[in-house]
Curated annotation (Swiss-Prot):
InterPro entries assigned to the protein according to its UniProt record, in alphabetical order: AAA+_ATPase, ABC3_permease_C, ABC_transporter-like_ATP-bd, ABC_transporter-like_CS, MacB-like_ATP-bd, MacB_PCD, Macrolide_Exporter_MacB, P-loop_NTPase
Record-stated family: Belongs to the ABC transporter superfamily. Macrolide exporter (TC 3.A.1.122) family.
UniProt cross-references to PANTHER family, sorted A to Z: MACROLIDE EXPORT ATP-BINDING_PERMEASE PROTEIN MACB, MEMBRANE COMPONENT OF TRANSPORTER-RELATED
Keywords: ATP-binding, Cell inner membrane, Cell membrane, Membrane, Nucleotide-binding, Translocase, Transmembrane, Transmembrane helix, Transport
Transmembrane stretches, start-end: 252-272, 278-298, 526-546, 583-603, 616-636
GO terms assigned for molecular function: ATP binding; ATP hydrolysis activity; transmembrane transporter activity
Native species: Pseudomonas syringae pv. syringae (strain B728a)
Highest taxon, organism lineage: Bacteria
Topology relative to the membrane: Multi-pass membrane protein
Compartment annotation: Cell inner membrane
Name the record gives this protein: Probable syringafactin export ATP-binding/permease protein SyfD
Main localisation: membrane
UniProt cross-references to PROSITE patterns, sorted A to Z: ABC_TRANSPORTER_1, ABC_TRANSPORTER_2, MACB
Species lineage: Bacteria, Pseudomonadati, Pseudomonadota, Gammaproteobacteria, Pseudomonadales
Length: 653
């Protein structure tokens, strides 16, 4: 005797219609044995479709007990019910319920994907099923390219993909012509003779006549359950048997297959609505482009500014007489001396030091007179300042010892006195009343901190002090901090040393490193402000993604129902839509980053002084942001999709 496969005891299913309850099933008691061919008949509204949904674990009874192969379904979770549908049931719908964007073989493969069957095995089985059902030449055809009978055979193949121990056929011939309907019925009869339990839900008496057992329903109750003694004789099959149930893969294989399916589905959904997808991505594209470009511009600007600061001596400390800039008493303080320079130079934290004295003097070359700042400095001055020579050389210690009448001029002085075509090296100019030979010209560097047209001339300190100005005290001292030494600590040490030597604090220091720190902080603050604006743009883009995904869930409700019917769990559906949201955002991110590089290239053509600097960190951050936006803003639509009721989803047009 066959075992009891499906058992219903006291099953009731009611629906709320407004303020009234509608009883679709009323105290149903039914047992269906393995291998039976059962027809459930009744007029429209009799409850036969609701009974099929309960039998197929697509719907839950309000009361009573339903067991599948001895397993009580009332205690199962939604995911466990999905596994039950996947492993035991195969659905054949009146309207086929094939996914229109997938080929026939891909529609058939779907249940095996959720079962974790390897790709090679499921493709082979799907192909054999379709060939067995006479569709060998239509494997890659989409539903729109198939006739009604062919689509129903694809639906049958899908129902058999995971074995189809129990076949639930809802009006399987209702949408077919007589020839196609007869072919489908012959297939179902063959399946039953091969050991499958087949349950036909129909109002067509001719279809029900093929069953060995007929159950009649009216107003949610079983009014008759009889053995069909008038069943027509079934001819012995002449065709080959259907391929056996495939061996299911492990969960890892299932996850890999699901991810592949999710990405394929996401891509198909995106390219099916190109304009909508582009508009959805627009906010993400603008946001990512803004973030990456702002960071690149900020980094480029910061490097440009810091480079200019370093050019004028970023690791230098200036010492001046008085208490601060603008001190009226500083002119009377004459305590800074050459011995202070020597004392500072001997300290381990000082790379080099130079004295400074200077005046504005009249400078003459032939019949050209100009006013220039003349400074007396040590030979190490140019090293301290990081100044390079464009022409010639700087003066050396021997020049200083001899009080040589040699000078180094800047580019502005060269242009004013000699013009761009005359070689100034070796030319004699009159500095005040002192004739001096030009031995070097400093490099012409464009600097945002020195845009003036001032003329500068440098000569050995000893020459300026002994031959030109007659001044023994210093106007200032410049020290260069040794590499690796903290500038702030060195500044404190310089203050302590000079205060100890002078016995009082009659000087002040100016550390250009503080300017660098200020520039860096300002740059970071500005970049943060602009990035926040860009983040707002990203958030707006994310909301757009969420809106369009909610629309997508609504449009694809029936697809979700089909996937649930063939065994998709809630987590599978949730993953499907999350992947789609992430893909939208990632593609938008890639386009945004690409646009940033285009902007950087155009920027380099328009602005020669400095360039946008793209960092790997900002690009990686952009990708991470894109992914997070997809996850965060795609979660609600994905959750909504996963929580859909299979019956309601299948009923949507």
């Amino acid at each position: 005797m066959s075992r009891a496969l499906l058992e219903l005891n006291g099953v009731t299913r009611r629906f709320v219609a407004g303020e009234k309850d509608f009883i679709a099933l009323n105290d149903i008691n039914l047992t269906i044995n393995a291998g039976e061919l059962v027809a459930i008949t009744g007029a429209s509204g009799s409850g036969k479709s609701t009974l099929m949904n309960v039998l197929g674990c697509l719907d839950h009874p309000n009361s009573g007990s339903y067991k599948v192969d001895g397993r009580e379904t009332g205690t199962l979770t939604d995911d466990e019910l999905a596994e039950l549908r996947r492993d035991h049931f195969g659905f054949i719908f009146q309207r086929y319920h094939l996914l229109p964007h997938l080929a026939a073989i891909q529609n058939v493969e779907m249940p095996a994907i959720y079962a974790g069957t390897g790709k090679g095995m499921r493709v082979e089985r799907a192909q054999k099923l379709l060939e067995r059902l006479g569709l060998s030449g239509h494997l890659e055809h989409r539903p729109s390219q198939l006739s009604g009978g062919q689509q129903q055979r694809v639906s049958i193949a899908r129902a058999l993909m995971n074995g189809g121990e129990i076949i639930l056929a809802d009006e399987p011939t209702g949408a077919l012509d007589s020839v196609s309907g007869k072919e489908v019925m012959n297939i179902l009869l063959e399946l039953n003779s091969a050991g499958h339990t087949v349950i036909l839900v129909t109002h067509d008496e001719k279809v029900a006549a093929h069953a060995e057992r007929i159950i009649e329903m009216r107003d949610g109750e079983i009014i008759a359950d009889r053995v069909n003694t008038d069943r027509p004789i079934i001819n012995e099959k002449t065709t080959e048997r259907l391929p056996t149930k495939p061996r299911q893969g492990n969960r890892l294989m299932a996850n890999i297959g699901l991810f592949q399916e999710a990405f394929v589905m996401a891509w198909v959904a995106l390219i099916s609505h190109r304009m909508r997808t582009l508009l959805t991505m627009l906010g993400i594209i603008i946001g990512i482009t803004s973030v990456v470009s702002i960071v690149a511009i900020g980094e480029g600007a910061k490097r440009y500014v810091l480079k200019d600061i370093q050019a004028i001596g970023s690791n230098t400390i200036e010492v001046f007489p008085g208490s601060d800039f603008g001190d009226t008493k500083s002119m009377d303080i004459q305590t800074l001396a050459l011995s202070d320079v020597a004392a500072l130079s001997s300290e381990y934290y000082i790379d080099s030091a130079t004295p400074n004295i200077g005046r504005n003097l009249l400078v003459r070359y032939r019949n050209i007179d100009v006013s220039a700042t003349v400074s007396g400095v040590s030979p190490s001055y140019f090293q301290v300042r990081g100044t390079k020579m464009g022409l010639g050389v700087g003066f050396n210690k021997d020049d200083a010892r001899r009080q040589a009448q040699v000078v180094v001029i800047d580019h502005n002085t060269r242009i004013r006195l000699f013009g761009p075509k005359v070689d100034p090296l070796g030319q004699v100019i009159l500095v005040g009343n002192l004739p001096c030979t030009v031995i070097g010209v400093t490099e012409n560097k464009k600097n945002i901190f020195d845009t003036s047209k001032n003329l500068n001339i440098w000569m050995p300190y000893e020459t300026a002090s002994g031959r030109l100005l007659g001044q023994t005290y210093l106007d200032g001292i410049t020290v260069r901090v040794k590499d690796g030494q903290p500038s702030k600590v060195v500044e404190d040490n310089v203050n302590k040393l000079l205060q100890k030597r002078h016995g009082t604090k009659d000087f002040f220091t100016y550390n250009l490193d503080s300017v660098m720190q200020t520039v860096q902080k300002t740059s970071q603050s500005l970049a943060l402000l602009l990035s926040l604006i860009a983040v707002i743009s990203l958030a707006v883009g994310g909301i757009g993604v969420m809106n369009i995904m909610l629309v997508s869930v609504t449009e694809r409700t029936r697809e979700i129902g089909i996937r649930m019917a063939v065994g998709a769990r809630q987590s599978d559906i949730r993953q499907q839509f999350l992947v789609e949201a992430v893909m939208v955002c990632l593609i938008g991110g890639v386009i945004g980053i690409s646009l940033s590089f285009v902007i950087g290239y155009v920027f380099s053509l328009l602005v020669k002084e400095w360039q946008m600097v793209f960092s790997l960190g900002s690009i990686v951050t952009a990708f991470i942001c894109s992914t997070l936006i997809g996850i965060v803003f795609g979660f609600v639509p994905a959750r909504n999709a996963a929580q859909l009721d299979p019956i309601e989803a299948l009923a949507r047009d």
